[in-house]
């Protein structure tokens, strides 16, 4: 067995753009023959996948599944809406979700490691970067899920509610984007940050500090209601809050999770004219 040196791994990385561990594995399998390693990597799609890895994957799908008293939600990203609808991509996402449910896996790194070879092969076949971005689970007495297309997914856990009510609550979460269950759940740092923003606004209006502070107290109550599920107007009956709805049904929401495709990912905006100009200079 030939010695796989650091310099050999470095050379293969520079020539293929693949990761260090992928290069080391390829060299080991090729007994240190770098040309054979490159050929094998081309056949497996590893080189093509490495080249695609730098592309921003901000499109994709959200998948949900309820298994007894535990529900799972998963986001898998690709680069375009076209690939997000591809049967092969959808099947890959379904397979990852099934594995998460079967193994009760909530560590996305575990899923990434488990499906890396299949991901690389799919990248080579489809021609876009693909990323298993995040996975989460929710336990509860009564569980409900809702998907708005494949781009928004919601899980809701409740007590004392029937399945229809939980489904409606999940639809509400999808539409209204609450961040917390109840106003009192809003974290202290979020409250303090908003308080300072509102105080600055009130002070800029020329009000004395004492009056400004009283104004802000009223605004903060409104703010914590707006960002919490129970404080929001129910989307299907805006005349009542979600909290009032739950009280009528003698029910309580114990938790929810909302995923939206690509949230928090910055998409690269391509300047087509600049791209063409750059290409013309190279030719």
Curated annotation (Swiss-Prot):
CDD domains recorded: UBA_EF-Ts (cd14275)
Alphabetical list of Gene3D superfamilies matching this protein: 1.10.286.20, DNA helicase RuvA subunit, C-terminal domain, Elongation factor Ts, dimerisation domain
KW Lipid metabolism (keyword) present: no
Record keywords: Cytoplasm, Elongation factor, Protein biosynthesis
Pfam families (alphabetical): EF_TS
InterPro entries tied to this protein: EF-Ts_dimer_sf, Transl_elong_EFTs/EF1B, Transl_elong_EFTs/EF1B_dimer, Transl_elong_Ts_CS, UBA-like_sf
A Gene Ontology molecular function term of the record: translation elongation factor activity
GO terms under biological process: translational elongation
Primary location group: cytoplasm
Keyword hit for Transcription regulation: no
Cellular component terms (Gene Ontology): cytoplasm
Source species, domain of life: Bacteria
Subcellular compartments: Cytoplasm
UniProt region (Involved in Mg(2+) ion dislocation from EF-Tu), positions on chain: 80-83
Matches recorded under SUPFAM superfamilies: Elongation factor Ts (EF-Ts), dimerisation domain (SSF54713), UBA-like (SSF46934)
Role this protein plays: Associates with the EF-Tu.GDP complex and induces the exchange of GDP to GTP. It remains bound to the aminoacyl-tRNA.EF-Tu.GTP complex up to the GTP hydrolysis stage on the ribosome.
Protein family (similarity comment): Belongs to the EF-Ts family.
Protein name as annotated: Elongation factor Ts
Species the sequence originates in: Salmonella typhimurium (strain LT2 / SGSC1412 / ATCC 700720)
UniProt gene name: tsf
